[in-house]
């Protein structure tokens, strides 16, 4: 597996600093971060690259020790969130008077700063307004708040000898954007940042559905550069050359594997080739992102993970639907406890329509009906339930579409270690669609119903043409149901995050270049394959209960 350089951090904090815990938990999600939490500053700081202090009173001796640590090349992040926090003169700031707690618009002073790469132009944080008034000429404002038509510094850095210091009065430690900014600040203080580093990317398989999407996503993501595109088809190579004239166009996987300008390869070929091509590219020392599903069997994913470990390269799955607006809204609602503990879930995709004539409908290539959309839907299920899947039951029907090898309908039932249940159904013989989402929690429910939208184009002769937008690409109507203490069920529309393009590619670059966590970790993509394989085995045996390994 691809290993990031260790980042050794010492955090000095008191026992009553529970507000800081979400940020510390975030740091713990990254294996390369070695975090040590202590109540007071030890005499020996040599094992650490960065020290975090949390507004606790530092003695004059502590100030001296921190100054020696920083001037020798260390980093110091001072979190000045306590009302009575005092700033050491070494920080180069004086803390202004506290203002009201309100939503602040926080902006990077320089949006080309390494800490700002691939982050939004502005983040909104509920925080007391407490400015940092600079008293040192070399103090640099990294973040400021819009305050009464002024730029009010909220995160400031300065050099001290061979090291660096940063301080901030921002304290919304459960805000994911602030967590990412503070982590990047720690990297910056340690002397590491992605700066202008680039990963050359090759696309293996210029599929009509995803080839151009990946090319555009790479081009829109700082830190990634499209270097080459490879496909066996002359027609697809010609299309790739037209779409991306600056990319090298290759016709063999061997040529792509040997290309010295390619660091990362995105494999966008049919599922029955995923394992073989991933192994070939990783054996050549390339990082790999594979289209979903990661593979068809657990034996294949085991071999792929072993190769990634052996060659110390990155391996992950293109789980781009983790960034769909409806999934993100549901995940946010669960994180906020809006329906209590999730214990039951159903998902559905399909309709009553002749299956396509592509490989998606041919089981020896696709893996079967559940492997196609199930690669996304079961990934959602795995990510929303904290416990591991224990048992799987698969059932299928073959009644109408005898010209294709896929089943007409497949259902996958999953039971988790905590007793929770989930179901995924893909049906091409459903004259009436079930809801896309049906979630039950201990305090409420979420229902997501499919939408149907037509787009009209004017025609001077025929008046207009209408086109369907595929239901799978439309955000469903999401409704939250909660039981009021009076016994009534109250319903409301679920809040939706804004739609943003190419978030998968941005997250991939964040992981490769800074070590930030993947939204869809490899181990979860491996679990998806294990569930799909167990469901296929169960369906083949008439719906047997398949027990998954721990």
Describe the residue ranges of each PLM region:
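N-terminal Rossmann-like dinucleotide-binding module
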Residues: 1-30, 194-244
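A glycine-centered loop/beta-turn motif at secondary-structure junctions
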Residues: 4-6, 26, 30, 133-194
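A short, well-structured beta->alpha microelement
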Residues: 28-45
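C-terminal glycine/acidic-rich active-site capping loop/insertion
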Residues: 198, 320, 443-519, 523, ...
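Predominantly a Rossmann-like dinucleotide-binding segment in NAD(P)-dependent oxidoreductases
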Residues: 209, 321-404, 410, 542
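Rossmann-fold dehydrogenase core element
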Residues: 303-320, 341-347
């Amino acid at each position: 597996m691809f290993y990031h350089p260790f980042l050794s951090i010492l955090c000095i904090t008191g026992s009553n600093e529970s507000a800081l815990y979400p940020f510390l938990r975030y740091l713990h999600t990254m294996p390369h971060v070695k975090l040590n939490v202590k109540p007071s500053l030890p005499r020996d700081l040599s094992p650490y690259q960065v020290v975090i202090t949390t507004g606790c009173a530092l003695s004059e001796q502590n100030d001296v020790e921190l100054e020696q640590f920083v001037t020798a090349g260390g980093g110091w992040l001072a979190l000045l969130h306590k009302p009575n926090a005092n700033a050491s003169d070494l920080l180069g700031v004086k803390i202004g008077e506290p203002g009201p707690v309100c939503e602040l618009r926080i902006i990077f002073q320089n949006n080309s700063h390494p800490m700002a790469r691939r982050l939004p132009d502005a983040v909104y944080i509920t925080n007391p307004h407490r400015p940092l008034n600079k008293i040192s000429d070399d103090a640099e404002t990294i973040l400021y708040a819009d305050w009464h038509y002024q730029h009010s510094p909220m995160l400031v850095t300065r050099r001290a000898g061979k090291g660096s210091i940063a301080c901030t009065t921002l304290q919304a430690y459960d805000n994911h954007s602030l967590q990412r900014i503070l982590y990047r600040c720690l990297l910056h203080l340690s002397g590491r940042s992605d700066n202008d580093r680039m990963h050359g990317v090759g696309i293996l398989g210029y599929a009509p559905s995803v080839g151009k999407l990946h090319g555009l996503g790479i081009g829109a993501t700082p830190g990634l550069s499209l270097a080459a595109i490879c496909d066996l088809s002359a027609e697809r190579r010609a299309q790739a050359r037209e779409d991306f004239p600056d990319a090298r166009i290759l016709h063999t996987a061997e040529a792509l594997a040997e290309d010295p300008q390619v660091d990362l390869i995105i494999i966008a070929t049919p599922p029955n080739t995923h394992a073989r091509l991933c192994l070939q590219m990783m054996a050549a020392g390339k990082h790999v992102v594979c289209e979903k599903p990661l593979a068809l069997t657990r034996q294949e994913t085991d071999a792929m993970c072993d190769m990634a470990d052996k060659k110390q390269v990155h391996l992950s799955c293109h789980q781009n639907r983790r960034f769909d607006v409806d999934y993100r809204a549901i995940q946010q609602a669960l994180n906020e406890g809006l329906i209590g503990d999730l214990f039951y879930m159903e998902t559905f995709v399909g309709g009553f329509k002749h299956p396509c004539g592509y490989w998606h409908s041919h089981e020896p290539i696709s893996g079967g009906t559940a492997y196609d959309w199930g690669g996304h839907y079961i990934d959602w299920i795995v990510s929303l339930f904290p416990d591991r899947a224990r048992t799987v039951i698969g059932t299928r029907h073959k009644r109408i579409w005898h010209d294709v090898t896929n089943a007409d309908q497949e259902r996958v039932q999953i039971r988790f270690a905590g007793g929770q249940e989930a179901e995924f159904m893909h049906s091409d013989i459903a004259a009436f669609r079930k809801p896309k989402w049906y979630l039950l929690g201990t305090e409420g429910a979420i229902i997501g119903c499919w939408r149907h939208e037509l787009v009209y184009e004017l025609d001077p002769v025929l008046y207009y043409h209408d086109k369907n937008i595929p239901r799978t690409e439309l955000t469903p109507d999401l409704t939250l149901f909660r039981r009021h203490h009076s016994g009534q069920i109250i319903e409301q529309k679920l809040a939706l995050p804004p739609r943003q393009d190419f978030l998968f590619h941005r997250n991939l670059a964040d992981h490769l270049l800074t070590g930030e966590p993947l939204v869809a970790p490899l181990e979860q993509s491996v679990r998806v394959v294990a569930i799909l394989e167990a469901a296929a085995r169960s369906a083949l045996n008439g719906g047997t209960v398949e027990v998954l390994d721990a």
